[in-house]
Amino acid sequence: MSSNSFLTPRIIEVHNLSPLRAKVVMEPFERGFGYTLGNALRRVLLSSIPGCAPTKISISGVVHEYSTIDGLQEDIVDLILNLKGVVLKLHSKNSTVLSLKKDTEGIVTAGDIESSHDVEIVNPEHVIAHITSGGRIEAQITVEKGRGYLPSVNRSREDKSLSSIGDILLDASFSPVRRVSYTIENARVEQRTDLDKLIIDIETNGSVDPEEAIRYAARVLVEQFSFFADLESTLLPTEQPRAPAIDPILLRPVDDLELTVRSANCLKVENIFYIGDLIQRTEAELLRTPNLGRKSLNEIKEVLASRDLSLGMKLENWPPANLENYVKEPGHASS
C-alpha cells in the first residue's frame, strides 16, 4: 500500500437496537478522520434530514391558541403540544390538509386523524387529547415537508396570507432525527494501531430508518464537497480605479472668470491657470503676489462668490493626474 494513500473503511456494521435506534460502526480511518467525519455527519443528521410536521391548525369554535373547548380536558396550548408529537410521512406531496373529527367520549389519538393514501401516520397510538361527556373536536391540520426548525413567527412575517382568523400557525420541527452521538475508538490494521473506529449512535422518530438517515447525510456531504474537488480559480473582473468626480467649473481656466487684465496677469505669474488652482490659495498668499493689491483681491473674491466658491478651499487629489484629458473632454473649455 502506498504511504500517500488514505485508508477507507473496510468494515461497516449496523446494529439495530430498536426500530428507532441504531449503532453504525465504521473502521478503519486514518488518525483524526474519525472525529472529522463523525462531527460533520452529526451536524448534517441533526439539521438537514427532511421530514414532515404539522404547521397550521384550525379548530372549530377556536379563535386563538389561548382558548378552551367545552368538553375537552386539555386547553388549546396543551393540544398543540400533543399534536407536535404526531409523526407523519408524506409519500409524494409536499403539503396536505388532514381532518380530525371526534364527538365520542374518550381518548383522541393520532389514529383518529383522517388520512389519505399519500399520508402515513407512524405513531397512531399517540395521544392528542381527551374528550369528556358531551364534548367534541373538529379541526383541519396542515402538514408540510421541510428541514430543520421553522418558528411560526418567521412564516407569519414572510407571508401574511398564510393565516386568517381562527388559523393557528405552529412552530414546526421537521427533523426526524431525535438524537445523534458519536464516539471514537482505536482500530488496528495489520501492524498499525494508530487508526480510528467511528461509532455513530442515532435515534429517529420512526419516519426514517436510522441507516437511511446516515446514507442521506453522507450524500449531502459528498455533494457539498464535490464542489471543492473541481475547484478552479476564476478571475473576477476588476474595475479600474476611477478618478473622483470633479466639479467641471474647477477645470475651467481663470480667464473664464473675466477678471481685469491686471488681476489675470498676476495670477498667471503665480502659475494659477485653473479655477481649481485659484480657490486653494488663501488671501494672504494672493496678497504676496507682485502687483496684486487689495482691490484685485476683492474683485477675485466677488467673482468667486458669484459662483458659490471662495478662497482657501481644500481639494483632494488636485491637480488630477489626467488634467489635460479632463480639459479636452466635450463640455470643458480649454485654456
Curated annotation (Swiss-Prot):
GO biological process: DNA-templated transcription
UniProt catalytic activity: RNA(n) + a ribonucleoside 5'-triphosphate = RNA(n+1) + diphosphate
Entry-linked Gene3D superfamilies: 5' to 3' exonuclease, C-terminal subdomain, DNA-directed RNA polymerase, insert domain, RNA polymerase, RBP11-like subunit
EC number assigned by the record: 2.7.7.6
One Gene Ontology term, aspect cellular component: DNA-directed RNA polymerase complex
Region (Alpha N-terminal domain (alpha-NTD)): 1-232
One Gene Ontology term of the molecular function aspect: DNA binding
Top EC class, one word: transferase
Subunit structure: Homodimer. The RNAP catalytic core consists of 2 alpha, 1 beta, 1 beta' and 1 omega subunit. When a sigma factor is associated with the core the holoenzyme is formed, which can initiate transcription.
Role this protein plays: DNA-dependent RNA polymerase catalyzes the transcription of DNA into RNA using the four ribonucleoside triphosphates as substrates.
Comment, domains: The N-terminal domain is essential for RNAP assembly and basal transcription, whereas the C-terminal domain is involved in interaction with transcriptional regulators and with upstream promoter elements.
Name by which UniProt lists this protein: DNA-directed RNA polymerase subunit alpha
Natural source organism: Nitrosomonas eutropha (strain DSM 101675 / C91 / Nm57)
